[in-house]
Each structure stands twice: as structure tokens, then as C-alpha cells.
């Protein structure tokens, strides 16, 4: 929903009815990799993204002649962090210059590159204003999906668009969550 104010957007959201069929899901990554598991994207045929072996030198030979070897699995749990301030972004499209200006509470390398690639823009068609006061991120405010969305809408509508997460939005759908990994 795009609206002139947050109140209007929230009122409009109440009028939306979503008719969705719940899909099967798997929370354990190792179970998801089993051939018997339902693929997240059926057209891919499996839940495996990449199957590649990286080898530097005669690793198997080195292990065969080693007196001792150690094998173990490392797991760290899912985490959620709470930045002091939630993510905010403002985008403005200048149709004359074909330039997207982004102001965001971000401290991230390759931010501009990720936005231009997602929006299919040349890399010199974006100006990111990093001069916004930013604090309390602790490395978790990425905001790429927010910035791409706001940049797209600003370009489509031809007017400045901003998105400021509230705390509930940040906890539900922000970028401050890390998956469980093995």
C-alpha cells in the first residue's frame, strides 16, 4: 500500500482481503535437502541451491597420510537483533537525469550496487546519501529489500517515497534476523 500518510496506509490495509492457500514448509535445512522433501520452488526440482566442491591442492592425499584427523559439525542458532533505530529509506527518481537518489539509515558496502542490479539500472544511475545520521545498527540494518521497493515505487510514481519501519515491522519482517546454520 502506498499512501500520503501512515494512517491512510493502515486504513487501506484493513480493506485488503488475502485469499491464500497455506503451503507446506520445512524448518530444518537438513530435512529440506532430502529428496523426499517438497521443493520450495518446484520448477527447480530440489531445495539444493549449489552443489560444488572447492578443492585447493591434493586434499584427499593429505588426509590419507595424516596421522590424525578431526571431523565435526558446527551449529549456531537463529538470532534476532534489535537495532536501536529501525530502518528508514527515502527515494526520489529524477526522470530528467535518469537518477535515483537514496537517503537511508545504512552503513553497508555494495549497497548502491545491489539496488541498481535489482532495479536493472546502470551503476551510475544512483546516488546514495550516506550523510544520514545512523546509529545503533550493530551490523544488522541491511534494508536492501526496503530500498529496492521504495526506489521502484518512486520511479514508477515519479514522486519521492519513504518507508520507515516501526518496531513491530522490524521484528516481523526486518533484515535483523540470522538463520540457523550448520
Model-derived segments and their meaning:
Residues 1-12, 16, 138-182:
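Glycine-rich and small/hydrophobic secondary-structure elements
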Residues 70-74, 102-104, 126-130, 161-166:
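General beta-strand structural signal in soluble alpha/beta enzymes
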Amino acid at each position: 500500500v502506498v499512501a500520503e500518510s501512515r494512517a491512510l496506509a493502515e486504513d487501506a490495509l484493513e480493506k485488503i482481503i488475502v485469499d491464500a492457500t497455506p503451503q507446506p514448509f520445512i524448518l530444518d535445512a537438513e530435512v529440506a535437502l532430502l529428496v523426499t522433501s517438497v521443493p520450495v520452488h518446484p520448477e527447480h526440482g530440489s531445495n539444493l541451491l549449489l552443489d560444488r566442491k572447492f578443492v585447493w591442492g591434493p586434499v584427499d592425499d593429505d588426509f590419507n597420510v595424516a596421522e590424525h584427523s578431526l571431523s565435526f559439525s558446527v551449529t549456531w542458532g537463529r538470532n534476532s537483533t534489535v537495532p536501536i533505530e529501525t530502518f528508514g529509506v527515502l527515494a526520489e527518481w529524477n526522470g530528467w537525469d535518469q537518477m535515483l537518489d537514496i537517503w537511508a539509515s545504512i552503513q553497508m558496502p555494495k549497497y548502491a550496487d545491489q539496488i541498481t542490479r535489482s532495479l536493472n539500472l546502470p551503476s551510475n544511475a544512483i546516488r546514495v546519501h550516506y550523510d544520514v545520521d545512523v546509529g545503533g545498527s550493530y551490523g544488522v540494518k541491511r534494508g536492501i529489500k526496503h530500498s529496492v521497493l521504495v526506489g521502484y515505487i518512486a520511479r514508477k510514481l515519479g514522486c519521492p517515497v519513504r518507508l520507515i519501519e516501526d518496531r513491530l515491522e522490524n521484528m516481523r519482517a526486518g533484515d535483523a534476523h540470522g538463520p540457523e546454520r550448520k
